[in-house]
Amino acid sequence: MSANLYQFPLTVSQWGASPSYLTDITVGRNGQEVRNAVWQDPLYRFNAAFAVKTYADIETLIEFFHAVKGREQSFLVKDWSDFAITRQTIGTGDGADTTFQLIKTYTTSFGSYQRTITKPVAAEDSTGVQVWVNNVAVDAANRSHSTSTGIITLTSAPANGHTVEASCAEFYVPVRFDVDMIDVQLLSYWVSAGASASNVMIPDIPLVEVRFPNE
């Protein structure tokens, strides 16, 4: 099931998302480890409780929870700690291909990781997706992009060896609730204490990224 186009109605800004990998570790009799990365790409997790600050927020959350029927339906959320792509290379022309996947590359001295971005905003200007081929900006009339896959389509194929670059001012993460029940009583106590009191347990309303077939 593809993520519905509607977005989570509250702002999950505090702390941002938590990327999580899955690794199998086998420990031998001598204590040596064999590690295997089960997932090459992480799943991002959020705690929606951080978005609840008022009783009106609780009402909005409950209404949305009913609309998506708990864990059944997916939706979009903005990761305020990581929601944009600065101009970077996404591919190289071969004279034939006209489609290129929007990606975000994270680079350190240790290595790099390419994250596939599937849910960019629709705009095709500085507020959304921009594209360059061989260091020349591609006019919006000569390209398009999908807000459900992140695939950029050019009207003409870049010449062999020409670098294709892109930027994205804002993208979303497809998620679902990871619970089928919300503790409204604990949420109310959280709000009454100021939604930040150090002596009050933070409610847990987990959201987890979803992957769809063929992604």
Predicted regions and their residues:
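A surface-exposed beta-strand-loop module
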Residues: V136-H162
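Generic detector of short, aliphatic-rich beta-strand segments that form the cores of beta-sheets
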Residues: H162-C168
